[in-house]
Design a protein with these regions (language model features):
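N-terminal Rossmann/SDR dinucleotide-binding element
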Residues: 1-97, 126
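Active-site Tyr-X1-5-Lys
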Residues: 157-190, 195
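Glycine/proline-rich active-site loop of Rossmann-fold NAD(P)-dependent oxidoreductases
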Residues: 195-207, 223, 284-295
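Conserved Rossmann-fold NAD(P)-dependent oxidoreductase catalytic core, especially the SDR/UDP-sugar
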Residues: 90-95, 101-106, 110, 114-161, ...
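Mid/C-terminal beta-alpha module of Rossmann-like enzyme folds, strongest
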Residues: 280-347, 389, 393-404
Length: 404
């Protein structure tokens, strides 16, 4: 039976938003998405290119509306806003700035806080429209206790403007819902990674940026080692033949990379695969009792840093990387390589020293008897994720002739 009205979605070019859009299109839904054009590509071209990466080839049911969440009225004319309000039955707000730097604070708040307010204003035009807001579990900030699904602002401090802005956005949604202006549900995924069945991922934030940085350094070292073996003695005496900060190739084909990473082995990161997040959100969204509730799409069994990092290093063929406390850098100064990593990975290092424990009882109850379960992060799971991504990096480097 065809659905009478369409879905309106923001953030269709993002990781989660593109997968949600793809699922709706596969289900035969009419989907209208808000997107910006770029310097070189139209809004529609950007959306279609992103959806093709997710496996979508038919766009008959897709309408792309050019606009911007950071602008009043989403940058749309009154006629277009009224048409959207009358032609859609659900609004999924996935768009967000993922930046975290303090110097970008104004832009982050413009996108994440003002943008949410502008989406709420659209939904208010026709009361009763269902608003689904995608937030993050990390609005819990620097808390180290159990973060409950019904909590928003409990006086916590934040690691960065991104977390704070997403918390502020939730407060806007919550206030509008309590006032009866919108009918809303909020979803808080944790660290979203690739598909649990294939390992495939289409956006490369978070832990993938860390892996890419490591992989690039290792490939550069292996290439230089190969060149050195084939070079004359005179050619190996200069900087090109020198080792990088104590790095060396081992007889077993692995690389020793003396790299200290600020973090704690016994702390965790909460990884959730994209398919679980999408399946879970859609299942929950169809439950009438989900109206007015917030859900942690998090892993009930978070992964210890002392488990995932060594397994990633094993697959990459590197030894010598270890998590240390701040005192280690007091006793032994930071190396050039460590300084480089700290600069590139500043955002992600914030999370290696501890995170809250996310209570997800609402999600577990809602998904009970549905067959939707979050997989545990095992050695096999990590191998699948890493295998796909390493193959992807190698193929991209080969096609682009990447200078390592």
């Amino acid at each position: 039976m065809p659905h009478p009205k369409a879905i309106f979605l923001t953030g269709a070019t993002g990781f989660l938003g593109s997968h949600l859009t793809a699922r709706f299109l596969v289900e035969g839904r009419q989907v209208k998405v808000l997107a910006r054009s770029s310097k070189d590509l139209s809004a529609r071209h950007r959306v279609e290119a992103t959806l093709q990466d997710v496996g979508i080839t038919e766009f008959e049911n897709l309408t792309v509306v050019e606009g911007d969440i950071s602008l009043d009225g989403l940058g749309l004319s009154a006629d277009i806003r009224n048409d959207l309000a009358s032609s859609v039955e659900e609004v999924w707000h996935c768009a967000a700035s993922l930046s975290f730097q303090d110097e970008n604070r104004a832009e982050i708040f413009r996108m994440n806080v003002d943008g949410t307010r502008h989406v709420v204003d659209l939904v208010k035009i026709v009361p009763g429209h269902r608003l689904h807001h995608v937030s993050t579990a990390y609005i819990a900030g620097k808390r180290s206790d159990v973060a409950l699904e019904n909590e928003i602002d409990v006086g916590q401090t934040f690691r960065n403007p991104y977390e704070e802005s997403k918390c502020r956005a939730e407060l806007i949604i919550s206030e509008a819902h309590r006032a009866g202006a919108v009918t809303a549900s909020i979803y808080r995924p944790s660290i979203v990674i690739g598909d649990s069945r294939s390992g495939r991922v289409t956006h490369f934030h978070g832990v993938y940026a860390f892996i890419r940085a490591l992989w690039t350094v290792l490939e550069r070292m292996r290439r230089r080692a190969s060149e050195t073996r084939n070079a004359s003695p005179r050619e190996t005496q200069g900087p090109r033949g020198a080792a990088m900060g104590g790095t060396r190739s081992l007889n077993n084909g692995r690389v020793h990379l003396p790299l200290r990473v600020l973090g704690m082995d016994n702390q965790t990161l909460n990884f959730v695969p994209i398919d679980y997040v999408v399946d879970g959100m859609l299942e929950i969204s169809r439950r009438k009792d989900s109206i007015g509730s917030t859900y942690h799409l998090t892993n009930p069994v978070p992964t210890k840093n002392g488990f995932w990092l060594p397994n990633i290093c094993r697959i990459l063929g590197v030894e010598g990387i270890r998590l240390v406390g701040e005192s280690s850098f007091v006793m032994t100064p930071t190396s050039k390589l460590e300084a480089l990593f700290q600069k590139q990975m500043a955002f992600y290092y914030q999370y290696l020293q501890g995170e809250p424990r996310f209570d997800c009882r609402r999600v577990l109850e809602a998904l009970k008897n549905t067959g939707i379960q979050c997989p545990r992060v095992t050695v096999e799971f990590i191998s699948k994720m890493m295998g796909w991504y390493v193959d992807f990096l190698a193929s991209q480097a080969g096609r682009a002739g990447l200078e390592l």
